[in-house]
Amino acid sequence: MCLMLLLLLNLEATVKAAVLIPQSSVCPNAEANNFLQNVKVNLKVINSLSSKASSRRPSDYLNRSTSPWTLSRNEDPDRYPSVIWEAQCRHQRCVNAEGKLDHHMNSVLIQQEILVLKREPEKCPFTFRVEKMLVGVGCTCVSSIVRHAS
C-alpha cells in the first residue's frame, strides 16, 4: 500500500513538472521508444587531494610567481559548472627578484582542456551536451625567442 502511494505521488510530481516547464518542439519526445524518463547524474566532486596539499592557498602562487596572473570569473548559467575562474597573465614579460620586468623572458599562459555540460537547446531545460573548453590555469616564464636577421 505504501509503495503504491509513493508511486502515485511520484507520478503526480512528474505530471506537474511537465506542465510547469514549457517544452519546445525540438525537445526529445517523452513518448518516443527508448526515451529515458528519469536520469540522475551525481555531479558531486570528490576531493582526492591530501589535506596538506589542499591547505595551500592557490592565491599565493598567482602573486609570488615570476609570471604573475589574475583570475577572472567566467559565468554561464547554461553551463555546468556555471562559474569557472580563468587565469590571465598580468604582463607580457616576467618579473625578476627586484620586481622589475625582465625583457629576456616572456610570460605565457598555461591552458588546460576541461569538460563541461552545456544546456542544449536552450528551450529544453534538462538536455545537456558534453563540451570541451580550454581554460587558462596559470602563467609561466619562458625564454624569449631571438631571431637574427640574415
Swiss-Prot record:
Effector cytokine of innate and adaptive immune system involved in antimicrobial host defense and maintenance of tissue integrity. Signals via IL17RA-IL17RC heterodimeric receptor complex, triggering homotypic interaction of IL17RA and IL17RC chains with TRAF3IP2 adapter. This leads to downstream TRAF6-mediated activation of NF-kappa-B and MAPkinase pathways ultimately resulting in transcriptional activation of cytokines, chemokines, antimicrobial peptides and matrix metalloproteinases, with potential strong immune inflammation. One of its GO terms (biological process) is innate immune response. Residues 1-17 form the signal peptide. The gene is Il17a. One of its GO terms (cellular component) is external side of plasma membrane. GO terms for molecular function: cytokine activity; protein heterodimerization activity; protein homodimerization activity. Belongs to the IL-17 family. This is Interleukin-17A. It comes from the Eukaryota. It is found in: Secreted. Keywords: Adaptive immunity, Cytokine, Disulfide bond, Glycoprotein, Immunity, Inflammatory response, Innate immunity, Secreted, Signal. Residues 62-72 have a biased composition (Polar residues). The keyword Protein transport does not apply. Homodimer. Forms complexes with IL17RA and IL17RC receptors with 2:1 binding stoichiometry: two receptor chains for one interleukin molecule. IL17A homodimer preferentially drives the formation of IL17RA-IL17RC heterodimeric receptor complex. IL17A homodimer adopts an asymmetrical ternary structure with one IL17RA molecule, allowing for high affinity interactions of one IL17A monomer with one IL17RA molecule (via D1 and D2 domains), while disfavoring binding of a second IL17RA molecule on the other IL17A monomer. Heterodimer with IL17F. Coiled coil: none annotated. Residues 54-75 are annotated as: Disordered. Disulfide bonds join C89-C139, C94-C141. Glycans are attached at N63. It comes from Rattus norvegicus.
